[in-house]
Amino acid sequence: MYSNKNDKDKDKDQNNENNKNNDDEAISLKILVVGKLACGKTSIIQRYCHNNFQPKYKPTIGVDFQQKVLEIMGQKVLLQLWDIAGQERFGHMTRVYFQNAHGAVIVFDATRSGTFLGAKAWKDDIDYCFNNENLPTILLANKCDLLTPPYTFPEDINTFCEQNRFNKYFYTSAKEDTGINEALEELVKIILESYQTQEQSTGFKLSDQSQSTETTPTQSKTCC
């Protein structure tokens, strides 16, 4: 009986150690979610992280963030989605939250052409803050449930993405839960693949950078 108890204790300790190792293997990815006012950024995050939709609009003040754990390409990922306010008066303040980001989502309202043009300004801002290092970035045409295909925008969206170095674009609807999971999972894949390539060529590991990603405000050295 005594030896059986010891065996159970050993098994329990081993299970705890395995769980700890699994937690240690998870990496954190900080994703910026930006775009002009009332494009549905918060609704996209709420739909993705909590699978709910609030039709009543409430603007984000400054910055907020939500988290979701997922597994992609055999890698456990803690995804941190940073909801950046779209109001111009918060522009200078919110840029300090760009530091240590691994990727970005730029959102525009498919029913408002001005927000499509505003997406370029956000991409230019990100490129400037990251010294034109081409941070993995996707473009979301949100509220597509309010339009009838084929969708038309001030510029051809394929050409627009190529010229402004977006990795991909997606048609999304937070209300109808369309395209959001696919978009964010694809962005994570792009990030993981890019760092796998970097790791092979330089020995750099994504986890090295992830450890420096914080959930508290830190002042950016490259963008203000």
From Swiss-Prot:
Disulfide bonds: none
GO terms assigned for molecular function: GTP binding; GTPase activity
Gene Ontology biological process terms, A to Z: intracellular protein transport; melanosome organization
SMART domains from the UniProt entry: RAB, RAN, RAS, RHO
PROSITE patterns: RAB
Residue ranges, annotated region (Disordered): 1-22, 203-224
Listed Low complexity bias regions: 209-224
Residues binding GTP: 35-42, 83-87, 142-145
GO CC annotation terms, alphabetical: endomembrane system; mitochondrion; trans-Golgi network
Motif Effector region location, chain numbering: 57-65
Residue positions bearing lipid (S-geranylgeranyl cysteine): 223-224
Keywords noted in UniProt: GTP-binding, Lipoprotein, Nucleotide-binding, Prenylation
Superkingdom classification of source: Eukaryota
Family: Belongs to the small GTPase superfamily. Rab family.
Protein name per the record: Ras-related protein Rab-32C
Lineage start: Eukaryota, Amoebozoa, Evosea, Eumycetozoa, Dictyostelia
Gene: rab32C
